[in-house]
Amino acid sequence: MRALLLILLFVFISPFDVSADGRRPLDLPSGGAGDGDEEEDAPETINFWGGEYEGDAFFWCLDKSCSMSWNGEIQDLKQEFTQTLNSLSSQAEFGVVAFSEGHIAWNPMPQRANPANKGSAIAWVQSLQAAGWTCLGPAAVETLNIANQCSKAMKQMLVLSDGEPYCNGSNTASQVLNDVAAANWQQIPVNTIYIAADSGGISFMQQLAQQNNGTFYQPQ
């Protein structure tokens, strides 16, 4: 009788897998429990002025010098920025700096691209007025300082301008290259977008992108 009971116990218990600590494992859906985190950290592709950029955080440095009003570029900037920012998911982060004789930042810290922050940044960019010199250097450094505070893995910086950096009557191209190189200790890609019809600023914008692992783009 005892032998029969042992056989019956073995038949009923043996089909169930038991983990090393004696607990039966739980049934998990295919892919495990980490799918949500992977989706949250996935990079996004944005289209800004016709150029495509992939990342999970985007930081703009935007020219608002007087020449940006000559052919309506400042209005185009506002439209392009609005469309691009609205395309970001709330998982992405971003920052915006605008420059002319001086520079101003929408926020000194990187922010999530949630509806409230996107609305605030769009309203801020829409209020920009074109005036003054093209003092890019300090603005680019400020943009990098904001980006450096972001913990995302695929950060991208986008510099938009319609010419070489002239500040208070002097060409500051060499100084800008040096200042950006010193500030970019995280080696964030610095992508440049040159929107002028002439070729005056192409060489500088190409060099700025090349020295910082970015791309140069000139819309046609």
Task: Give the location of each predicted region.
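Von Willebrand factor
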Residues: I104-A105, M109-K155, P189, I193-F204
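Acidic, polar low-complexity linker/tail segments
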Residues: A20-F59, K64-E73, P115
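DG-centered beta-turn motif at the end of beta-strands
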Residues: D63-S65, L77, V96, T143, ...
